[in-house]
């Protein structure tokens, strides 16, 4: 049995009553109903009401309006979207290095393994280790990666018109890595041999980075992206090191040789936060991004020959 519009209106009234019990002022009931039905009552209230609770009280700060809570929700959305773009720039840099190193490695392996007249196809075992055990205990296996590669090969998109004709319907390393999710590309990296891993890390990061440190960087980025993908709050969430997630992302981006993502994050976060504070100046005393999050510091700071590899070969 489907709910009628009257049922949903009743639910909206109950929700307004609940918010008012916490001391939230609702000046425009239609605005409240529109926003909670459009974006989700729990998305806005459950995730962001705590920010406005006063001390150990069960009430929000005096004169807190629903409009303020919704604006705080929107602030997190804007910061989240900006951070995701900056992480995407990092992903592009990482994948570019991964592609170049793999193509060179494939060419070197082919030169050693085959003579000029042999069909020069490599197996996945020629390129990757059987498994890699991360510090968290998670095991990355070559066999699992092979199944991902097979699905990509069966379903990849043409990057430009005529690609399949040019490459005789063979997937190149470029398209293979391009089609991988960030997580799968990282798994591919961890299964590479140490020499190739070291070359990639040196190309991507400013200072020497150990594999263990890289694991931490990647895991923090994955956690951030997973929370963002499911629209969980990020402004008031800390990682296992008691650090707010936006700050973790920014610190990771500062380690890159390509400083465009960090510069962009700093500049755009500054604009987003300042625009928010212009409308809600009293939030300067409460906003985590200017206090515990320590983004106030942020506001102050100023190819190779294509290798041919049989990605579906057994081994």
Where are these regions (language model features)?
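Extended intrinsically disordered or low-complexity regions, especially N/C-terminal cytosolic tails and loops
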Residues: 1-223, 235-315
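Acidic/aromatic/glycine-rich contiguous surface patches that form carbohydrate-binding/processing clefts
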Residues: 231
């Amino acid at each position: 049995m489907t709910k009628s519009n009257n049922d949903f209106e009743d639910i909206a009234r109950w929700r307004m009553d609940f918010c008012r019990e916490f001391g939230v002022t609702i000046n425009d009931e239609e605005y409240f109903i529109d926003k909670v039905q459009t974006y989700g009552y729990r998305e806005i209230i459950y995730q962001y009401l705590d920010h406005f609770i006063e001390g150990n009280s069960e009430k929000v700060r005096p004169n807190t309006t629903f409009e303020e809570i919704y604006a705080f929700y929107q602030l997190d959305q804007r910061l989240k979207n900006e951070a995701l773009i900056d992480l995407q720039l990092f992903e592009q840099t990482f994948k570019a290095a991964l592609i170049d190193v793999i193509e060179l490695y494939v060419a070197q392996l082919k030169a050693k393994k085959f003579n000029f007249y042999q069909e020069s196809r490599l197996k996945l075992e020629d390129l990757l280790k059987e498994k890699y055990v991360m510090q968290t205990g998670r095991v990355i296996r070559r066999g699992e990666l092979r199944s991902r590669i097979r699905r990509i090969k069966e379903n990849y998109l043409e990057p430009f018109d005529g690609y399949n004709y040019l490459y005789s319907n063979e997937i190149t390393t470029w398209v293979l890595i391009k089609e991988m999710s960030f997580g799968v590309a990282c798994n591919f990296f961890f299964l590479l041999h140490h020499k190739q891993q070291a070359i990639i890390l040196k190309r991507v990061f400013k200072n020497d980075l150990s594999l263990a440190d890289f694991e931490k960087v990647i895991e923090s980025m994955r956690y951030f992206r997973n929370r963002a993908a499911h629209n969980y709050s990020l402004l008031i969430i800390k990682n296992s090191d008691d650090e707010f997630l936006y700050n973790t992302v920014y610190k990771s981006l500062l380690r890159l040789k390509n400083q465009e993502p960090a510069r962009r994050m700093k500049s755009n976060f500054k604009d987003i936060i300042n625009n928010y504070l212009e409308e809600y100046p009293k939030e300067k005393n409460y906003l985590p991004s200017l206090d515990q999050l320590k983004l106030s510091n942020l506001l102050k700071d100023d190819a190779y020959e294509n290798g041919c590899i049989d990605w579906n070969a057994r081994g």
